[in-house]
């Protein structure tokens, strides 16, 4: 059994909301997020698969964590690559649940992570790149693995992508945090 705790902290690390449990924790936080707020998942076990929902509008992310995870609530330009519903309002439902063995071994998209962040965190899969157009969030590498597939435009959600700034040497790295076995790469969408 893993002891899990979810916390919402303000910019000064003061606790706004907190909940804990064994193998599952959920948290209803009645707070309007402010710049600098972050969501923290703490666990007494490392290197585990969990279902993590940092916001009900973002949905469930099946992730592999190697340590405690801090998710910084995005504001301003960092929000335009996300649904306008994400992190809005004053009532938020978050949860984390340790994955069962059958969920870990089932055939699935190993790269999907709607909760990936632009910064390095101990939460995988995680996408990084050597270039992202103008450093804008709508062109961040994480957009390639968030599950949003709208591609008939670009500039703001849902039309976000990995932008290579027309560079021939553009490269993306997808880190799984552990060795994985894959037999397919990608799915084209029109």
Language-model segment annotations:
Residues 188-190:
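Conserved small/polar residues in nucleotide/adenosyl-binding loops
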């Amino acid at each position: 059994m893993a002891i899990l705790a979810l916390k919402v902290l303000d910019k000064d690390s003061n606790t706004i909301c907190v909940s804990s449990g064994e193998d599952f924790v959920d948290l209803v936080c009645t707070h309007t997020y402010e710049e600098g707020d972050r969501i923290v998942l703490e666990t007494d076990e490392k290197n585990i698969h969990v279902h993590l929902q940092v916001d009900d509008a973002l949905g469930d992310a099946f992730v592999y964590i190697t340590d405690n995870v801090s998710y910084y609530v995005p504001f301003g330009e960092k929000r335009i690559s996300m649904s306008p519903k994400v992190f809005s309002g004053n009532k938020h439902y978050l949860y984390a649940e340790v994955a069962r063995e059958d969920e870990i071994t089932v055939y699935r998209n190993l790269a999907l992570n709607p909760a990936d962040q632009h910064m390095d965190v101990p939460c995988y899969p995680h996408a990084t790149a050597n270039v992202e157009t103008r450093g804008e969030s709508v062109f961040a590498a994480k957009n390639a693995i968030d599950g949003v597939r709208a591609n008939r435009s670009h500039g703001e959600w849902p039309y976000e992508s990995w932008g290579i700034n027309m560079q021939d040497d553009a490269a993306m790295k997808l880190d799984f945090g552990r060795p994985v076995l894959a037999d397919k790469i990608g799915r084209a969408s029109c």
